[in-house]
């Protein structure tokens, strides 16, 4: 568990309480059902795509067999066995096994944290005493309610597809809906149990001013904390148990995005989630407070790392101290507003008319059309014509700049970064040229710096031409070495 400073005893109480709850009362039937359904779904998905497994999945299985023993029956046999065995295992047997693992002997209590003068840690005796006290706390059986209501209780009348045509280059079906949304459908047979979705709209974080810079730093982490519709994030996970489906909205530098995937059998659920994230985002102050507390604790510890200070200094040097380029810090949370973030989210996703939804995978066009008409053609639209604001993109510092940064390290080392920037036309030829340049530099640096000079374990390089702002180009080389070299 991640613990707030000064609340080690509370965290220990919570851990011991939940362990004791399992020991005394076991898991509930609904908890077990969800876990079992999820396991069966995972095996089903692996079985359906058994002819598309990557080499590393076989390699990893052979390595496990060599190091740990066991069997390699193959997914066909494994799926058949799990399908037969899992439904026959009662909750009582699972609880009996779980309770047999929780005893009063061979218990290890581990506590780690930063070595800071203002943090007081308990002694070994105090920690053991707190643990014994926590075991005596009253524990009630776990109670939960799992909603059986539909994800969307009431739907509007379906919309219509205004136009359907075939893209001559890729053979995809392109639909234009009567609310302006475009939908691209491309059937592939690479994976039988997967449909991928991506949706984009021009705009993005550059449409927000300086007062929202700190809010943007956690925007994508926060917007789905509360779940969607009538379901909290926790309840939504329960409802989606046994389904291979995921959906996540986000904002980028110059776009709003919705990404997701689903098995063909769960495609309707994917469309329902898309509809909910556009029309019924949900706030949860308690979930946000928990997120904020965790982040502040993590960031305070992170800031003790000298290499983080090095990275911060590098970012300031490259982007001329532009606040939009800076990473999030613990102090930023003093300016971050959860209600404002949700306002920003609703503002960006209030108009779906300029979104393009692309679906790729095991798609049946006739089967997907009713979902498109019901869930996408009914999304709210305002007819806004937007594009990103390149003036709000952090500009790379011009001219030559040298910064020598010193910080004490337990293991002394020197880190050297060379960064070059410029402008180059954004096209396929230049992108490929930049990629090949990076690969050539990797080979040269490996031979000259690592092998011939023995100056480092390796050199990291990158070369990139951005599409937004168009043509912004940079080349970077990073090396860690002995200060004497």
PLM regions with names:
Residues 441-442:
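Short Ser/Thr-interspersed hydrophobic loop/turn segments at strand-loop and sheet-helix junctions
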Residues 33-37, 44, 64-210, 343, ...:
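Proteolytic maturation boundary segments
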């Amino acid at each position: 568990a991640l613990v707030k400073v000064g609340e080690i005893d509370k965290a220990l109480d919570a851990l011991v309480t939940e362990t004791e709850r399992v020991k005394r009362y076991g898991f509930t039937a609904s908890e077990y059902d969800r876990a079992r359904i999820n396991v069966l779904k995972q095996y089903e998905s692996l079985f359906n795509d058994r002819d598309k497994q990557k080499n590393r999945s076989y390699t990893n299985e052979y390595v496990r067999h060599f190091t740990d023993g066991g069997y390699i029956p193959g997914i066909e046999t494994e799926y058949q066995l799990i399908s037969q065995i899992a439904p026959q295992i009662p909750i009582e047997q699972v609880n009996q096994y779980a309770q047999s693992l929780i005893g009063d002997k061979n218990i290890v209590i581990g506590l780690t944290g930063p070595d800071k003068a203002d943090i007081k840690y308990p002694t070994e005796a105090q920690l053991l005493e707190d643990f014994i006290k926590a075991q005596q706390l009253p524990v009630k059986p776990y109670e939960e309610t799992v909603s059986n209501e539909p994800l969307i209780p009431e739907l509007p009348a379906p919309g219509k597809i205004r136009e359907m045509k075939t893209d001559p280059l890729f053979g995809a079906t392109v639909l234009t809906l009567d609310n302006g949304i475009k939908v691209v459908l491309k059937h592939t047979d690479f994976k039988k149990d997967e449909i991928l979705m991506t949706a984009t709209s021009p705009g993005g974080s550059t449409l927000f001013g300086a007062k929202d810079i700190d809010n943007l730093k956690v925007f994508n982490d926060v917007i789905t904390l509360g779940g969607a519709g009538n379901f909290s994030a926790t309840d939504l996970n329960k409802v989606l148990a046994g389904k291979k489906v995921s959906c996540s909205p986000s904002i980028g530098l110059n776009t709003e995005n919705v990404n997701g995937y689903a098995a063909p059998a769960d495609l309707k659920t994917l469309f329902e989630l898309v509809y909910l994230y556009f029309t019924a985002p949900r706030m949860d102050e308690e979930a946000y407070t928990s997120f904020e507390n965790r982040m502040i604790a993590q960031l305070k510890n992170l800031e003790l790392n000298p290499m983080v200070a090095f990275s911060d200094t590098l970012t300031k040097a490259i982007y001329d101290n532009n606040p939009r380029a800076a990473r999030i810090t613990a102090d930023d949370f003093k300016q971050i507003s959860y209600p404002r973030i949700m306002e920003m989210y609703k503002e960006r996703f209030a108009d779906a008319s300029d979104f393009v939804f692309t679906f790729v995978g095991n798609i049946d066009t006739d089967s997907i059309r009713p979902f498109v008409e019901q869930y996408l053609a009914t999304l709210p639209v305002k007819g806004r014509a937007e594009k990103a604001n390149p003036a709000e993109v952090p500009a790379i510092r011009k001219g030559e700049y040298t910064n020598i940064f010193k910080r004490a390290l337990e293991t002394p080392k020197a880190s050297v970064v060379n960064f070059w920037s410029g402008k180059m036309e954004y096209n396929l030829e230049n992108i490929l040229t930049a990629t090949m340049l990076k690969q050539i530099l990797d080979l040269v640096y490996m031979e000259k710096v690592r092998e011939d000079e023995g100056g480092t374990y390796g050199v990291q390089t990158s070369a990139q031409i951005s599409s937004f702002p168009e043509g912004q180009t940079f080349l970077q080389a990073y090396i860690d070495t002995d200060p004497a070299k």
